[in-house]
Amino acid sequence: STEVATAKHVYECLKAGIDILWVGARTTANPFAVQEIADALKGVDIPVLVKNPVNPDLELWIGALERIHNAGLKRLGAIHRGFSSYDKKIYRNLPQWHIPIELRRRLPNLPIFCDPSHIGGKRELVAPLCQQAMDLNFDGLIVESHCNPDCAWSDASQQVTPDVLDYILNLLVIRTETQTTESLSQLRKQIDECDDRSEE
């Protein structure tokens, strides 16, 4: 898989036999660039993943997915990689989990993957972010891995070795029980009853 940002990228990837394409966050933020990619993909059957735009704009993200879908591509997915912020105290990109959760509500059949490497920006944050994504029912993870992360040409601080990635994946707890609206309503009712008793 590889990232495409222009029609030329698409043509070169298809010529090289790349099997999955993704649209990066900066490209997703530009509807003209997304349309150029969508036009280049017309008549092609290839999986395309669309990262969230750098700014927290759900409509822009959905718009990019729709442009590619309208070009005839059916195998689409979304990648949540967090959102740019001046405040980089903890994360490189703020997760703002409510945005991909709303994307899931609006497009329930769309696979959504999490990119904990770009959210965290530091390799020590990758494992807890992987677990958090799984707890939020993401469909999968896209984790940056390198045999010698410190020598990686880009994003070295957020990459983990293949052995560390294997360790992280083996420690993940995958929850099988999902909450329904009805079960959440029942829990809210029980909480309200407890609150009412404590006020007496």
What would you call each of these model-derived segments?
Residues E3, D115-S117, D195:
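Conserved acidic functional residues
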Residues I18-D19, D139, D195:
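Receiver (REC) domain switch/active-site residues of two-component response regulators
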